[in-house]
A protein has these predicted regions:
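Glycosyltransferase donor-sugar binding loop
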Residues: 37-41, 195, 222-231
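Donor nucleotide-sugar binding/catalytic pocket of nucleotide-sugar-dependent glycosyltransferases
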Residues: 54, 135-180, 191
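N-terminal subdomain of nucleotide-sugar transferases
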Residues: 1-39, 51, 214-216
Length: 231
């Protein structure tokens, strides 16, 4: 399929919410777009755009050598079957195992580093292993995209991205579909809103402790959290 593109990601909701415009632009240019991502409820929306869906199952978090090897072999099989013009990967596991599969099959590929993840941020032996895997997986990438300069500088310093790199403007909200609205009346409350993933590594426990301390001294305060629960 010379005009097909293969998209690899770990989140159907993230792909639809933040990269929908990319998918639509590729489709409008005449490409056949196949998407490999676990189904958590957004696949029908992705298919409605005109994308082909490839059922995919893997754990977003954690490292299991056997399961991760199966994922890499699954990606390699997809690339041999679809023979895409190029592969675009998002998020850590698709970046690493999709990148390795692309190298093994000689498929051109582009990588989007959407974040470093707690493993790279925390250091230690596991960090060294991930860095080595990134170096191998990204070595032949046509381009490595980053969401911010900090991630780019870290990966370049660690020699994970030695070729063409770009910092993209961001993956923001489509303000045509999501129009700003007036903030609701607060009734005299002081409101704190945290937009975050509900994970220990992201500081949820510290936030809850701080909220309790502040609320005990200032009952007029209200703390709200917007985000997905992940652990």
């Amino acid at each position: 399929m010379a005009s097909s593109l293969l998209i690899l990601s770990n989140s159907d909701s993230g792909l639809y919410d933040f990269r929908k415009e990319v998918l639509k632009a590729l489709l409008e240019k005449g490409f056949r777009v196949a998407v490999s991502v676990p189904d958590t409820g957004y696949v029908d929306k992705i298919k409605a755009l005109g994308c082909d869906y490839i059922p995919t199952s893997f754990e977003r978090r954690g490292m299991n050598p056997v399961k991760d090897m199966k994922l890499m072999l699954f990606y390699r099989r997809l690339m041999k079957e679809y023979r895409p013009l190029a592969v675009l990967t998002y998020t850590i596991k698709p970046n690493i195992y999709g990148g390795l599969a692309a190298r093994l099959t000689g498929t051109p590929y582009l990588v989007n580093v959407t974040g470093l993840g707690t493993t790279l941020e925390n250091g230690g032996l596991l960090q060294k292993m991930i860095i080595l895997m990134y170096r191998t997986a990204l070595k032949k990438a046509g381009c490595v995209f980053f969401q911010n300069k900090g991630n780019r500088d870290f990966m370049v310093q660690k020699k994970c991205a030695s070729g063409k790199v770009r910092v993209i403007p961001g993956s923001g909200v489509n303000l045509t579909e999501h129009r700003p609205e007036e903030y609701p009346e607060d009734g005299g409350q002081i409101r704190f809103v945290s937009v975050m993933r509900l994970m220990k590594d992201k500081g949820i426990e510290e936030l809850l402790a701080a909220a309790q301390t502040v609320h005990e001294k200032h009952p007029e305060t209200l703390f709200q959290i917007l985000g997905a629960y992940e652990e």
